[in-house]
Amino acid sequence: MRFSTPIEISPLPFQLTPQSRIVVLGSCFAEHIGQRLAHALPPGSVCVNPFGVLYHPMVLARALAMIAFAPDFPEDVFFEGRDGLWHSWWHSGAFTAPTREECIRQAEEALKEAQAVLEKADLLILTLSTDHGYYLKETLSCGSLVANCHKMPSKMFEEKVTSLEQSISVWESLLPLIKAKFPQLHLLWTVSPYRYAKHGMHESQLSKARLHLTIDHLIHSKVANANSLHQENESMGLTDKSMLCKKISESFAKNSEIFGNCSEFFEKMSENLLKKSEIFSSNLGRDQEDCLPSMQKAAEESSDVVTSSLASTCDTWQHYYPAYEILLDELRDYRFFAPDMLHPSEQAVDYIWEKFRFAAFSPELQDCASQLYSIRQALSHRPLHPESEDYRLFYTQTQQRIEKFAQRFGFIPK
């Protein structure tokens, strides 16, 4: 007799190794999973939410474009709040500072760290949370869609539900560019199990359904999966920055709410892409169904492209992990929710994490993570009698374990 409906998860088509590099973007749930990944891998291997916690699919798309193509932040992204502190419309409240200069410094440092990890990354995890977005009524060059309202007056914003078509359009414009620049990358989508009671439970379910439909469309989209196309078509060499910039601008033309009128943004994106390749399809927007495999080939031939450290068994680069279903369909009990009855509890996050670990970790990384945990437990031990013979033996054995671990995995546990 069974009293639950377990979500059966087969091993993912790729396997993480101790050499893997991972970027995690998204909601609070992404933060929890990202922190656990950071504890299982060498220091500096995982970058978690370099823009802070983000919820909206198009806000995530903008953050990913910034990380991937390294444009400068628009001037009016940074502003002084009514609390006298400086904030960013593109970041969460984690990027708050007493001065504009300090706020910009924090944002730029986090961006550089994320860019360094993404350049070598073999896995990108994106967690979508809601398609309810907040838009500034005032027109700014950085666009009107904000990542966070930063406790500014509600009269400054308009809340809107992003259409399924617009979310798909943004990502179908961006993902082929991401895959062209980072051909070694795998993308893992998840939907946050957090429930938005403020929208009403019915609307919360509708919002999650739209996010699921967006992800499912992108995973099966020819446009978003430019690396798996096999159709032979004529290509044009877009070696001129203005031509490529025009193509990219046209791709995102319908989404000025996200990027605003950032001509410099698209110029920088074009310049960055041209460093990777001299050949791109003439159809970078919605017409990318016919783009050439040469788009990927040219990027792969770049001298600084990193070979994936994933143990991969598949050709597709987009995948889905059912974190939402594990909580809502398998656990489906309020004892697995936090006291607010909306967020998953720590126990639920641990359960979802354990399932992910067994689905995504290679045997080598499983061993590495287990040894790391055990060694850290030993290092955190506070002896009652540090001069005793038992503690001296324990200390010596721990140091020997650390040395063996470092010899095998190439870093010292801390």
Please give the residue ranges for each predicted region.
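Acidic, His- and aromatic-enriched active-site or binding-groove loops in soluble protein domains
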Residues: 149-159, 205-220, 343-345
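Conserved catalytic region of serine esterases and O-acyltransferases that act on ester linkages
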Residues: 6, 20, 337-341, 350-414
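Extracellular serine-dependent O-acyl
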Residues: 186-188, 212-225, 315-333, 368-371
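Conserved SGNH/GDSL esterase-like catalytic core that processes O-acyl groups on lipids
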Residues: 32, 43-126, 130-137, 156
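Active-site segments of SGNH/GDSL-like serine hydrolases
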Residues: 5, 131, 176-205, 322-330, ...
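Cationic, amphipathic, low-complexity segments that mediate targeting or membrane/lipid association
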Residues: 242-277, 281-289
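Serine-esterase "nucleophile elbow" of acetyl-processing enzymes
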Residues: 1-74, 214-217
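A solvent-exposed, charged loop/short amphipathic helix patch at secondary-structure junctions
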Residues: 138-164
